[in-house]
Regions:
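Glycine-rich phosphate-binding loops that contact phosphosugars or nucleotide phosphates
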Residues: 25-166, 170, 206
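Single conserved hydrophobic/aromatic residue that forms the stacking wall/gate
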Residues: 206-215
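Residue-level recognition of alpha-helical structural elements
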Residues: 1, 154-157, 177
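A short, well-structured juxtamembrane/interface segment
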Residues: 13-24, 174-187
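Secondary-structure boundary/capping signal
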Residues: 20, 53-57, 213
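An accessory alpha-helical subdomain
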Residues: 191-202
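N-terminal amphipathic/basic leader segments beginning at the initiator methionine
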Residues: 1-17
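Terminal, contiguous helix-loop blocks that mediate binding/assembly
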Residues: 190-191, 214
Length: 215
């Protein structure tokens, strides 16, 4: 996992494969479905859209699409790193059944197969990682969905963030970084941490110990 954390800058700079003639039409209501580490990318996209647009964004982390949601006719984005997450696949099938506008982010699996079969837009990320280890790739992927006139701007922000992160990491050796991380983890392992973040998703994501967080 450590090598993937240190590779975050390169992930943010990675050019990702998209479907032919990839275009995301404008929308006012977006439903994002994704579980676990894949769903975190949906939280990131919701944060960006909430800060920059008036678009209604709902992130769902459960099976299917409830009728009350489908009746709103939202644009749907389904995110599953493997492409085979049961909850997300069921939601795709509900979108097809209700004739909703949808697209996917995945490394393969059933999601990508369904997108190709139904000629829906997709962003494909490289396979072979655990979803949480692919955070940079999934963050880059969701930036394709900001809007048709702003996606290039946010994709470039990801590239710049990756460059900056690589520059910061290059100033210290891997052993120095690991030593700092180990010392910090030992200091907080027996304590209750208090974390302040700019957004809820930044504050609580990946917490594994009893923690108080605030925004």
């Amino acid at each position: 996992m450590i090598e993937h954390v240190l590779d975050l800058g390169n992930q943010l700079k990675k050019e990702l494969e998209t479907s032919t003639d990839f275009v995301i039409d404008s929308y006012n209501d977006l439903l994002i479905v994704g579980m676990g580490g894949s769903g975190v990318a949906g939280d990131v996209l919701k944060l960006v859209l909430n800060e920059t647009t008036q678009i209604n964004v709902e992130v769902r982390k459960a099976y299917g699409i409830p009728k009350v949601v489908a009746d709103r006719r939202p644009k749907c984005l389904f995110i599953s790193y493997s492409g085979n997450t049961e909850e997300t696949v069921e939601a795709v099938n509900d979108a097809i059944k209700n004739n909703l506008d949808w697209s996917v982010i995945s490394s393969g699996g059933q999601l990508l197969e369904l997108a190709k079969e139904h000629e829906r837009p997709f962003v494909k990320v490289p396979p072979g990682l655990q979803p949480r280890a692919a955070f940079g790739l999934m963050t880059k992927a969701v930036m394709h969905y900001v809007s048709s006139d702003k996606d290039g701007e946010y994709l470039e922000m990801c590239n710049q963030a990756g460059e900056y992160l690589n520059e910061v990491l290059s100033n210290q050796s891997e052993n120095e970084l690991l030593a700092q991380a180990l010392n910090l983890s030992k200091e907080i392992s027996t304590k209750t941490s208090v974390i302040y973040g700019g957004t809820p998703s930044v504050s609580y994501t990946h917490l594994t110990l009893p923690t108080i967080y605030s925004v």
